[in-house]
């Protein structure tokens, strides 16, 4: 469209201008364009129904020329809608996301947890919490929190610490720079996360004469920062000097779409590749250099190599405490680090040699600079032996024949066998992410979707919705524990409403398996971690399940097909039925609360009470003092 077409102004409300602007925003990388904000989630109340709600309706039934559709989906919970948007963004490798709107007060505050999840995971979401009247004439309005010390602060200021960009629109003119900066942050690979623009309910509906040029198509180019020559030379020198280098591949490798380059680099150099939760699948599990998960929930192969490594090459990792085993994983006293990361904040961790660059660009440059380099034969043989030994343990965990209830690892083994290379498995919290990181044999970077930065119970059900919207061609399988289910089940209704075909696997063990085991190991005797009916004495001694609680029936009441099974063979048959169905299906299976889980080889720092009258806690504290001795800063 010519520049002349954008001369003059158009009179729109702030909300209408927001939707029209967002409908024409695009992201681009490697020559491929995407609609940056292809749709909207929203729950309406008096704070947004006549503002953004009206604007979305108008976009749907009376759009103007040059205004793209902004399809609206009605969710059931404000936190859930943000989780769905985050999962959508993660599945698109951060090239797209959804906008989310909520009403004033409790509706908007419900989005804070989702915002924190997105920012912690470095994935973009765009949030529009509604706010109190900017004019302050109706004051206090319904659902407004009053602060007697200032009239400036509202509950939406809670979004500030969990957002990568926060603004409040008190005048229409402020919208223009605010939205432009919002798009900048959403598409910045180093700065992305939750972007929050609070909108007072009166300002949303206020009319203004907007420059037409504001609504032209804009393409936001997602950058691939090249490697600085001097930084490359320093990294190459470190690698050449190392005898036992180990790559730790994080989510940044996948978001950069650098999997092919990682495989080629590993093949050329022989350097083994361990993965984090976010990075699993960046290298296929059957690659000769793939050594699986590393850290507190990693496997023996990755952890044994990490124990002795003299150089850690971190690619796109934020080094969470699970990756470093709370700073006990890398035991070589002379270990050094080279960190390749698009964010200097992450590249600087562990006193590393910093390579602030895109993962793909850096791997290409390193491969060229190390063309004549390969680890020695003895190290290659050790890598192969570790891989073989751990593969045998994985196979055992997948085929335990445990009874009377199956172990959840057997369910994971069945799923690992049944899922296709482009299908997606989703999880976030409890004992399952630990088992999955240790055991899951990821074939592609698409397949493994575990949110373990914020590890938010309740993520799994809405995340399946978001992932399926992003990849309708993939089978999306979300593994849900009964603890997570009871936190946030209501987006099952949204899935049924939208006719979204996903598969939920509900593992019911009547408690918190992960925290129960952690509680026991820290001397707290699984207190408050089992779903049991209170008896006449201590509920810890009462093993009776709560009568009348039926999660399978509850899921069916949301409009989901439910198949109840009790054995692994029945589970496989049920999965095949769910796979060919055109409706969302939940497969319900009871599993053993007490495992068994994969063998662990690394520690996690969870502090134990330093003084106690309980013998179990006293013993746990002695173990804790012993186990934390290897902790150190990497300087």
What spans do the regions from the language model cover?
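Phosphate/pyrophosphate-binding active-site segments
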Residues: 2, 6, 170-173, 211, ...
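N-terminal alpha/beta PP-like core and its mobile active-site loop of ThDP/TPP-dependent enzymes
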Residues: 2-374, 378, 414, 418-421, ...
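Short alpha-helical "patches" and their helix-cap loops
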Residues: 35-36, 378-381, 478-483
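Active-site diphosphate/adenylate-binding microenvironment
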Residues: 38-52, 387-462, 467-468
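Thiamine diphosphate
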Residues: 136-150, 347-348, 356, 363-364, ...
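Short amphipathic alpha-helical interaction patches enriched in hydrophobic/aromatic residues
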Residues: 163-166, 394, 398, 562
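Glycine-rich beta-strand-to-loop/alpha-helix junction loops that act as flexible
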Residues: 249-251, 315, 429, 480-483
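Active-site-proximal structural scaffolding
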Residues: 266, 305-306, 408, 488, ...
């Amino acid at each position: 469209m010519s520049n002349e077409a954008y001369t003059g102004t158009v009179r729109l409300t702030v909300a209408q201008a927001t939707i029209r602007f967002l409908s024409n925003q695009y992201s681009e990388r490697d020559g491929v364009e995407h609609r940056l904000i292809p749709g909207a989630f929203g729950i309406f109340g008096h704070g947004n129904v006549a503002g953004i709600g009206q604007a979305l309706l108008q976009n749907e039934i009376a759009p103007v020329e040059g205004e793209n559709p902004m399809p609206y989906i009605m969710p059931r919970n404000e936190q859930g809608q943000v989780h769905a948007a985050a999962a959508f963004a993660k599945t698109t490798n951060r090239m797209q996301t959804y906008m989310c709107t909520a009403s004033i007060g409790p509706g908007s505050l419900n989005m804070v947890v989702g915002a924190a999840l997105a920012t912690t995971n470095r994935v973009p979401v765009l949030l529009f919490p509604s706010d109190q009247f900017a004019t302050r004439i109706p004051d206090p309005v319904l659902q407004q929190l009053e602060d007697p010390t200032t009239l400036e602060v509202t509950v939406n200021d809670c979004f500030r610490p969990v957002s990568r960009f926060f603004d409040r629109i008190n005048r229409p003119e402020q919208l223009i720079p605010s939205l432009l900066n919002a798009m900048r942050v959403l598409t910045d690979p180093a700065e992305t996360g939750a972007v929050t623009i609070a909108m007072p309910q009166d300002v949303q509906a206020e009319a203004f004469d907007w420059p037409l040029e504001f609504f032209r198509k804009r393409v936001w180019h997602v950058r691939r920062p090249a490697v600085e020559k001097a930084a490359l030379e320093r990294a190459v020198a470190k690698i050449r000097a190392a005898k036992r280098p180990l790559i730790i591949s994080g989510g940044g490798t996948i978001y950069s779409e650098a999997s092919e380059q990682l495989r080629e680099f590993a093949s050329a150099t022989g350097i083994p590749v361990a993965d984090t939760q976010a990075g699993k699948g960046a290298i296929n599990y059957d690659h000769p250099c793939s050594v699986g998960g590393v850290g507190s929930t990693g496997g023996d192969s990755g952890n044994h190599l990490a124990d002795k490594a003299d150089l850690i090459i971190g690619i796109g990792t934020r080094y969470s405490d699970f990756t470093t085993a709370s700073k006990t994983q890398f035991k070589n006293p002379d270990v050094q680090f080279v960190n390749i990361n698009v964010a200097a904040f992450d590249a600087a961790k562990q006193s590393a040699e910093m390579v602030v660059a895109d993962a793909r660009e850096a791997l290409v440059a390193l491969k060229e600079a190390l063309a004549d380099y390969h680890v020695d034969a003895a190290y290659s043989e050790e890598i192969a032996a570790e891989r073989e030994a751990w593969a045998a343990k994985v196979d055992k965990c997948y085929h335990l024949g445990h009874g009377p209830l199956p172990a959840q690892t057997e369910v994971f083994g069945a799923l690992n066998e049944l899922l296709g290379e482009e299908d997606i498995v989703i999880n976030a919290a409890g004992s399952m992410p630990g088992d999955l990181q240790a055991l899951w044999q990821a074939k592609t970077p698409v397949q493994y979707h575990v949110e373990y930065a914020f590890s938010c119970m309740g993520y799994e059900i809405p995340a399946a919705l978001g992932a399926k919207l992003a990849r309708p061609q993939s089978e999306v399988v979300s593994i849900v524990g009964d603890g997570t289910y009871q936190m946030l089940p209501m987006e099952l209704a949204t899935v049924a409403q939208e006719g979204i075909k996903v598969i939920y696997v509900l593992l019911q063990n009547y408690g918190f398996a992960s925290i129960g085991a952690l509680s026991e190991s820290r001397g707290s005797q699984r207190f408050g971690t089992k779903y049991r009916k209170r008896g006449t004495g201590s509920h810890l001694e009462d093993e009776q399940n709560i009568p009348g609680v039926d999660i399978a029936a509850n899921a069916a009441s949301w409009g989901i097909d439910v198949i109840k099974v009790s054995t692994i063979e029945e589970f496989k048959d049920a999965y095949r039925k769910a796979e060919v169905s055109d409706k969302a299906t939940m497969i319900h299976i009871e599993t053993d609360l007490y495992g068994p889980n994969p063998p662990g080889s690394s520690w996690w720092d969870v502090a134990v009470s330093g003084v106690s009258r309980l013998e179990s806690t006293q013993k746990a504290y002695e173990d804790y003092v012993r186990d934390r001795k290897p902790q150190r800063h990497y300087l």
